[in-house]
A protein has these predicted regions:
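Structural recognition of the beta-strand scaffold that forms the well-ordered cores
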Residues: 3-7, 38-43, 89-93, 265-270, ...
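Glycoside hydrolase catalytic-domain groove-lining segments
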Residues: 49, 380-520
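Beta-sandwich interaction modules
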Residues: 147-156, 166-169, 199-248
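Substrate-binding cleft of secreted/luminal carbohydrate-active enzymes
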Residues: 35-50, 458-487, 498-584
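Active-site-proximal loop/short-helix segments
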Residues: 53-57, 98-119, 124-139, 343, ...
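Aromatic-lined substrate-binding rim segments of carbohydrate-active enzymes
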Residues: 26-29, 46-95, 102, 111-112, ...
């Protein structure tokens, strides 16, 4: 079994306080070889001309990545040349759904934003790092169901906000504080008229349903906190309770907002201060609110993780467990970084990036479909014009206005990925290189069209393999800490099913673990990793891909600090027994 390691230009270069140079990267690659690796999987953000590191990048706070790209305009070509010198192969990790920064809460530290923001539009954001092509074509991202967008026209001020409890009994209501903002950069107390009433009212509460459907529970009596007589003209406001309130409900049924005419207001949720990606800047009054972002929200039975692919509306929230509730008028029309593969020019652009990776000297391309996009409503995205038109042509149904078969919709969306993968495979093989594909278990790709799935797409993984589009299947997210027994059992079933299918077809397999050093003693971490390596080798995998470089190696003022040295001694011994020569 070979050992590879994933290196991430983003994490290694933007997280380091020490400047990277060409010589340091060269030393890094040699160090990786010396640890016993035979391959590098390079998560890169493009060369200088692709524009991902233009000035104002929200995740390059120190400017280290931009400075490096100025001196080494094509980092991937540099990596390939240096890696090949020491006998390492290089595989470009092509993350097709991470073509922009991940969350709408990301922004520039105060006073550092450029005059012209380089990013793509998001509610409450002040710029999102993205490839230049995507910034120039923001409508090529995955699009929301049109029924959920705010109607065009002049916004009327907000007059009423209602908070609904899930029963007719609510403990005492503490003082309520309202704060408002024009820019989501600084919040100030609301100074207008305001009246707070607590009562029990009859209501038919809404239940979450993907658009355009609407569902309701049984009519009943429910406790209601009504804040009325308002005159809020600002697009952003926050509500904070000064003490415990015991207010609990599903997100769909929790809040109603009306304007001065009594019409419902379309809005986006926010529950935590925005971040500068590396650290929180403190309270939302000074930092702003991370709208439409699902991190750390204490929902009951929430699946968790940045790759959560359900919508938040169905989950139950105790308001006592969040510091405030933020409201932004309107909805994000597009997801941050997920592209709409139904557009031919999107697939062409992604193929152009494959060509760039091949021209740089890569030995293969490792295609990954996971998205880091942080969004609270995944089920209501995927309604770009070509999807709508194709569904209407195939089934005679207008999915923007009528109820529709969501399984057929997921299946259709999956066909566009199949088109891309087939073309990418043909391009890669025409250069004599290898096509790798990530197979993901958490969230699972092993879903039927009728089931919830990663990005609400049917991933027809058996077809990819049976059609011969793939050379190596890379198993990723088949382990994670803090999973329920039921989740792990489901993952294990998929593992066996996929591994057996690969065996029947004679496909090579790789395994990418999901370790994290944080919160573990080094000896426990090493023991966990070694047990996984032995299990994976016993199951017949050809590659174990350590994930990722910054977990094990850190650049410091005194050079590179290598963690888990016992692990690398074991890896070198494994290579020695396999008859592999030392690399240096």
């Amino acid at each position: 079994m070979e050992f590879h390691m994933t290196l991430d230009f983003r994490d290694d270069f933007t997280a380091a306080s020490v400047p990277w140079t060409a010589e340091r990267l060269r030393e890094y690659i040699r160090l990786v070889a010396d640890l016993g690796m035979q391959g590098i999987h390079w998560i890169e953000m493009g060369d200088k001309e692709m524009g991902k590191w233009d000035r104002g990048s929200s995740t390059d706070l120190t400017g280290g990545a931009r400075a490096f790209v100025e001196s080494v305009p094509d980092p991937l070509a540099f990596v390939c040349e240096e890696a090949h010198h020491v006998g390492l192969k290089v595989y470009a990790v092509h993350k097709i759904n991470d073509m922009a920064s991940f969350g709408p809460g990301r922004f520039y530290p105060l006073g550092t934003a450029p005059d012209v923001l380089p990013g793509i539009p998001q509610i409450g954001g002040s710029g999102q790092m993205a490839f230049r092509w995507l910034r120039e074509h923001p409508d090529r991202r995955v699009e929301i169901h049109p029924s959920l967008l705010e109607a065009k026209g002049i916004r009327k001020p907000v007059r009423t906000i209602r908070f609904w409890h899930e029963t007719d009994r609510l403990q005492g209501v503490p003082y309520i504080e309202l704060l408002v903002s024009e820019t989501n950069a600084r919040y100030t107390p609301y100074r207008g008229s305001c009246r707070v009433d607590v009562s029990v009212r009859r209501r038919t509460p809404p239940v979450f349903a993907p658009a355009p459907e609407r569902r309701f529970a049984k009519e009943g009596e429910f406790a209601c906190i009504q804040i009325s007589g308002l005159e809020i003209s600002q697009p952003f406001f926050g509500i904070r309770f000064a003490g415990a309130v015991g207010l609990t409900n599903t997100l769909t049924a929790l809040v109603e907002v009306e304007d001065v005419s009594g019409a419902p207001v379309v809005f986006t949720w926010g529950f935590f201060p925005r971040s500068d990606y590396s650290t929180s800047l403190g309270t939302f009054e000074e930092a702003g609110i991370g709208f439409d972002a699902n991190w750390l929200i204490p929902f009951e039975n929430h699946p968790g993780g940045h790759d959560w692919q359900h919508s938040a509306g169905r989950y139950r929230l105790n308001v006592d467990k969040v510091p405030f509730i933020g409201i932004a008028r309107g909805r994000n029309r597009f997801l941050t970084s997920s592209v709409e593969l139904a557009y031919p020019d999107v697939r062409r652009w992604l193929l152009d990036i494959v060509q760039y990776e091949l021209d740089a000297g890569c030995d293969g391309v490792d295609i990954r479909v996971e998205s880091h996009t942080q969004n609270m409503d995944f089920e209501n995205y995927g309604f770009g014009k070509p999807v709508v038109e194709a569904f209407r042509d195939r089934y005679g149904v207008d999915i923007t206005r009528e109820s529709f078969d969501r399984g057929a919709w997921r299946e259709l969306r999956g066909e566009y990925f199949d088109l891309f993968l087939k073309d990418a495979s043909e391009l890669i093989r025409s250069h004599g290189k290898e096509t790798w594909i990530h197979l993901t278990a958490y969230p699972s790709m092993d879903r039927e069209p009728r089931q919830q799935s990663l990005s609400q797409i049917y991933w027809n993984w058996r077809r990819w393999m049976a059609e011969g589009w793939v050379d190596v299947v890379n198993f990723k997210r088949f382990q994670a800490r803090n999973l329920s027994p039921g989740q792990q059992e489901e993952i294990d079933r998929f593992y066996r099913k996929a591994l057996n299918f690969c065996g029947e077809l004679g496909l090579r397999t790789a395994y990418t673990p999901n370790p994290r050093f944080e919160g573990m003693r080094e000896e426990d971490f090493v023991d966990m990793e070694l047990r996984t390596i032995r299990r994976i080798a016993g199951d017949g995998f050809e590659v174990y891909n350590f994930y990722e470089g910054c977990t094990y190696i850190r650049l410091t003022e005194n050079g590179f600090q290598v963690n888990a040295n016992q692990l690398w001694r074991e890896v070198r011994e494994w290579n020695r027994k396999a008859g592999l020569p030392p690399r240096s």
